[in-house]
């Protein structure tokens, strides 16, 4: 029996990749609460300079990730997904270690760019599970996997803040590097993949990748949907604390209240993603996607009219429950409309669109709030999501008509 014929326990791989995504999500978000403080510690002074450099070191990671993702996706299709998971976990661990040793802001900026270049654990984990899970269970599998990164991202800021308070800023980077190295070890020892390497000559070029897709227009619309999801999430991030302060008035625990309101969508997504993924396997991810987008619009609009922080928290919890269905539904549809041969590149292209959304969303939110106020951000974001719902529905309708 050849190595490629050995059966794979995809559920065990799902468990290990879930842990890897959890650790990666936690590692990335561990340093987020004090990123501006670390920038200040590296010698940046003045309000405007601090804002500029904090924005740069935050966004440059996503920018370089968007550039590098297609390259790593192509390499994953040639060499296998496990080796890309190992490369990503070890590379990020080394970069995080070096970040804790940075002596000036330029070194830190370069290392943040390197983090984006060497990242990609989560999209490669998605590609691995997408190619191993049975098609009729891919919605549940990808929905479950998505909760790993969400769980880590929820716990990371809390743990990072506590660690920074007790041990200082630099040690948190060393702890984060250790967490990523554990992720590397878990992947090395426990993930199994049957993959026959493909020579560079046998690799499909971009034009051939597009030609091999069952419905290229639909796949493009799914990429755009991923971008819009991140734009919608990111547009609210820069103004959330300030909006909560406006709603709450003069209260002493504004940081706690805004932190709780920031985290409730993640908790809701954690609860809803596997269940809605399983429902998508039964009724079709297309229906889940469109309904979740419409519900998101209906929840975003009243957010601009709330009068108390608790009204906002309730709406954001419901929004998180709907959002928990979106990315897994997109990923399941990508699985349905591509082959295992190109899965790495398709998921990496999707990651690039996600990273672009991560960069543009906060910029859009900040620009709208500066010109028209906080409440306008929710209305404009609702309009963007509504456009995406119509665009996605039209793309899915065209595919259905083409099949008929």
Curated annotation (Swiss-Prot):
Keywords noted in UniProt: Cell inner membrane, Cell membrane, Membrane, Transmembrane, Transmembrane helix, Transport
Subcellular location: Cell inner membrane
Disulfide cysteine pairs (residue numbers): none
InterPro entries in the cross-refs: MFS, MFS_dom, MFS_MdtG_subfamily, MFS_sugar_transport-like, MFS_trans_sf, Mutidrug-R_MdtG, Tet-R_TetA/multi-R_MdtG-like
MF terms in GO: transmembrane transporter activity
Membrane topology: Multi-pass membrane protein
Bilayer-crossing regions: 19-39, 56-76, 90-110, 113-133, 144-164, 171-191, 222-242, 254-274, 288-308, 317-337, 376-396
Major localisation: membrane
Superkingdom of the source species: Bacteria
Cellular component, GO annotation: plasma membrane
Family that this chain belongs to: Belongs to the major facilitator superfamily. DHA1 family. MdtG (TC 2.A.1.2.20) subfamily.
NCBIfam families, alphabetized: PRK09874.1
HAMAP family noted in UniProt: MFS_MdtG
Protein name from the UniProt record: Multidrug resistance protein MdtG
Species, as recorded: Salmonella paratyphi A (strain AKU_12601)
């Amino acid at each position: 029996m050849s190595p490629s014929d050995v059966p794979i326990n995809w559920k065990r791989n799902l468990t290990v990749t879930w842990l890897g995504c959890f650790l990666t999500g936690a590692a990335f978000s561990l340093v987020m609460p004090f990123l501006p403080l670390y920038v200040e510690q590296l010698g940046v002074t003045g309000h405007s300079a601090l804002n500029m450099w904090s924005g740069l070191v935050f966004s440059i990671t996503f920018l370089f990730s968007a550039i590098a993702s297609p390259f790593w996706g192509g390499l994953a299709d040639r060499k296998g997904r496990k080796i890309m998971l190992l490369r990503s976990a070890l590379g990020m661990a080394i970069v995080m270690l070096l970040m804790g040793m940075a002596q000036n802001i330029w070194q830190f900026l370069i290392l943040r760019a390197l983090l984006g270049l060497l990242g990609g654990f989560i999209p490669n984990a998605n590609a691995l599970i997408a190619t191993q899970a049975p098609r009729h269970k891919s919605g549940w599998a990808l929905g479950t996997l998505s909760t790993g990164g969400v769980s880590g991202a929820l716990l990371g800021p809390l743990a990072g803040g506590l660690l920074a308070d007790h041990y200082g800023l630099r040690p948190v980077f060393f702890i984060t590097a250790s967490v990523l190295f554990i992720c590397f070890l878990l992947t090395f020892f426990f993930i199994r993949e049957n993959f026959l390497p493909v020579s560079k000559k046998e690799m499909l070029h971009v034009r051939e990748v597009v030609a091999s897709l069952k419905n290229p227009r639909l796949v493009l619309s799914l990429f755009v949907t991923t971008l819009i999801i991140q734009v919608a999430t990111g547009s609210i991030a820069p103004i959330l604390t300030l909006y909560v302060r406006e709603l709450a008035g003069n209260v002493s625990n504004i940081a706690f209240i805004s932190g709780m309101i920031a985290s409730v969508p993640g908790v809701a997504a954690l609860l809803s993603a596997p269940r809605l993924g399983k429902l998508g396997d039964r009724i079709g991810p297309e229906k889940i996607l469109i309904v979740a987008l419409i519900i998101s619009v209906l929840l975003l609009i009243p957010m601009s009219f709330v009068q108390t922080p608790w009204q906002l928290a309730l709406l954001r919890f419901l929004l998180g429950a709907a959002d928990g269905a979106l990315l897994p539904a997109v990923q399941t549809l990508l699985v349905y409309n591509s082959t295992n041969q190109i899965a790495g590149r398709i998921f990496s292209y999707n990651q690039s669109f996600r990273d672009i959304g991560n960069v543009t969303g906060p910029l859009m939110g900040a620009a709208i709030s500066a010109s028209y106020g906080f409440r306008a951000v929710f209305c404009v974001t609702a309009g963007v999501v509504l456009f995406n719902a119509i665009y996605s529905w039209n793309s899915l309708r065209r595919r259905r008509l083409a099949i008929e």
